[in-house]
């Protein structure tokens, strides 16, 4: 608590840092134990393009220590016609066109900064999403499906101003990144004063009261199931599963993950969808990103992903392959029985082992020889509505590799493609009728100190122009049941779709709008009045 209320670094230290770093987080920590991440998002972001909220609920539902609220991004790296494209003002020396994944690598290198001890794991960097189609810049895939959504392949915000809510000690760290945009040694003092002014502006904004509505649910006007549309109808989807099985029998792949998209109208705000999803399906990766494409069309990504693709912290590289699932039981005994059933399912175990081997192979490309190890194998982890078989594969980053190289080696997750990955990717282009968009890509950040935390974009909704799009898939093997696999896609898509549906029924209330029955004559009437 000794550092509360002190802007850091001071001008002299800032001058020293600026001599060898193009990005310096100027920050102020305040005690704000009455604030919540949602409240801070309302005050600082308000759903404007380039803003975000990232949170994490640990296994068991407890919220993790940090929540990250992005208030302003001076530039966003995205794509236009398959080429790198910047919105806003890109820093000097970074690619402004060409291969977008090269632009990610070169931007990280150009703005690489020191690691600041004692700060949260993320203070500056690129944050957003890389969609499934990004893989086409790393793999030779020549037959892409129809691009019906016309979504950018990626969108990564260059974080300028942000707040970090510390759930453990009740503080908020306000950060204004001083970014040397013109790569010049001039105007260093001016950059510090500008960052200090922005920190003070953030403080003023979180100190200003903002209406925080209290909400209740009204009965939904439309039935949930009736409001969902399948972009790929079930008979056609089942036929694709058959073709996937033929490829497995022919020895082309061991497994392939065939997905389909669901759609529905969305009249709710992205924040309300996130609020519902946060309440009903807390997961290790919770996020809302507000973005725009090169044509100025705004869209949002709201998600609740249980699965990391990969994290890099210093030299430590970690991935958590997840494969195999059961719903949570309604009682403790039922939950235990389902977990035992999952552990005993030979098909689930075989698929999981295959994906653990794939993760080991991916990490071996970028880690020190002999350092890749499985530290957790096929253990049941329970989430709010589902349980999974989870393993942990770790390695030590090779001296010649960086976080970008780890991303390239592991993207996309084998749990979303199948194995062997190269052939599975080509097979998916043949079987799926539309490009996947955000589904199966990643969301998260690459920071300028060299770390990375990327979640797989599943259990996520794309919200754009009054529509919600949710995609889900299931890994099939030779003896898979097609109807069961089809139902699995429905089950996996249910959480974000229900969040969209429920958010449309949220209604803000005031004391004057609350009504109560005039009299209560029996227990039955209480039930009726509250039903």
From Swiss-Prot:
Binds 1 Mg(2+) ion per subunit. Chorismate binds at residues 324-325, 439, 459, 473-475. It catalyses: chorismate + L-glutamine = anthranilate + pyruvate + L-glutamate + H(+). Keywords: Amino-acid biosynthesis, Aromatic amino acid biosynthesis, Lyase, Magnesium, Metal-binding, Tryptophan biosynthesis. It is an enzyme of class 4 (lyase). Its EC number is 4.1.3.27. Gene3D superfamilies: Anthranilate synthase. One of its GO terms (molecular function) is anthranilate synthase activity. The keyword Metal-binding applies. Residues 506-531 are annotated as: Disordered. Its cofactor is Mg(2+). Mg(2+) binds at residues 351, 488. Feedback inhibited by tryptophan. L-tryptophan binds at residues 56, 284-286. Residues 511-531 have a biased composition (Low complexity). GO terms for biological process: L-tryptophan biosynthetic process. PANTHER family: AMINOBENZOATE/ANTHRANILATE SYNTHASE, ANTHRANILATE SYNTHASE COMPONENT 1. Part of a heterotetrameric complex that catalyzes the two-step biosynthesis of anthranilate, an intermediate in the biosynthesis of L-tryptophan. In the first step, the glutamine-binding beta subunit (TrpG) of anthranilate synthase (AS) provides the glutamine amidotransferase activity which generates ammonia as a substrate that, along with chorismate, is used in the second step, catalyzed by the large alpha subunit of AS (TrpE) to produce anthranilate. In the absence of TrpG, TrpE can synthesize anthranilate directly from chorismate and high concentrations of ammonia. Belongs to the anthranilate synthase component I family. Heterotetramer consisting of two non-identical subunits: a beta subunit (TrpG) and a large alpha subunit (TrpE). This is Anthranilate synthase component 1.
